[in-house]
Amino acid sequence: MGLKASLSLLSLTILLVFSKVVTANNITLAFQKYSKFSTMRDLFIKTKLIAAIDKYQTITVLAVSNDAISSITNRSEVELRNILMTHVILDYYDELKLQGMREKSIMLTTLYQTTGLGEQMNGFLNVSKSKGRVYFGSEVKNSPLNAEYVSTVYHNPYNLSIIQITMPIVAPGLSLAIFPPPPPYVHVAPYPTPMDASVVPAPGPAADDNSPDSAVPKTPPAPATDTPEADSPAPAPSADNEKIEAADKAKPSSSASKAGWSFDVILLLAFLASFAGF
């Protein structure tokens, strides 16, 4: 009995390990086999989700064709990772199980819910059946159920299933959960730079300078010159000064007349003396 129990335990361990390896490898192989899912395969590799999926033994991947998934390829790598995680269901579903649904609507847990960042049910999906058709959408309130089931691409019962849907599912608020708003920017005014007194600008004109008179340029004072006082016009002579000047002018005339008389007398005496000699 002990030997049989040991063999059973060993077989179970090998099966679990093998199943885990098959899950990771089959995801890559399944996407490589179908070229119409090459974009989604590249996104799974780019966002390093293959290793995260490898931790689970039972999953269902909602695959989207290259044309349909192009609507989200321009998002950031973090947003792409979150969106792709909502396309990984932590349960097994294939066409048989979907068509055999008893309830009209079922809530599904996705890989994104395991991150602890889920808000308002955006880590869950809703699958509903209506008139023989199956639709997927976010479990967030009022989210549309517009991703329709197309077909089962790959299935390994109760281990791995890859099913195609018509369009990607973008749950509201995924980016908000990853990118919290930054703290508000506080503007700090710079300290004023001390200025040297020599470079301080002169005060502006006073308020009175705004009057109309201030618009007329003022004539600067004439510079002082060394011009002698004689250059300035002489004052008008008074009556007394005129008399004195007239007297001064008359004196030379009197002297001249006296000198003339003396000369005549000398000539007369000389003439008389010449007669006396005879």
UniProtKB/Swiss-Prot annotation:
Where are the residues of the annotated region Disordered?
199-257
Segment forming the signal sequence: 1-24
Where would one find coiled-coil regions in this protein? none
Kindly list the residues that the UniProt entry marks as GPI-anchor amidated serine lipid attachment points.
255
Give UniProt keywords alphabetically: Cell membrane, Glycoprotein, GPI-anchor, Lipoprotein, Membrane, Proteoglycan, Signal
Q: Which family does it belong to?
A: Belongs to the fasciclin-like AGP family.
Q: What is this protein called?
A: Fasciclin-like arabinogalactan protein 5
Species, as recorded: Arabidopsis thaliana (Mouse-ear cress)
Gene that encodes the chain: FLA5
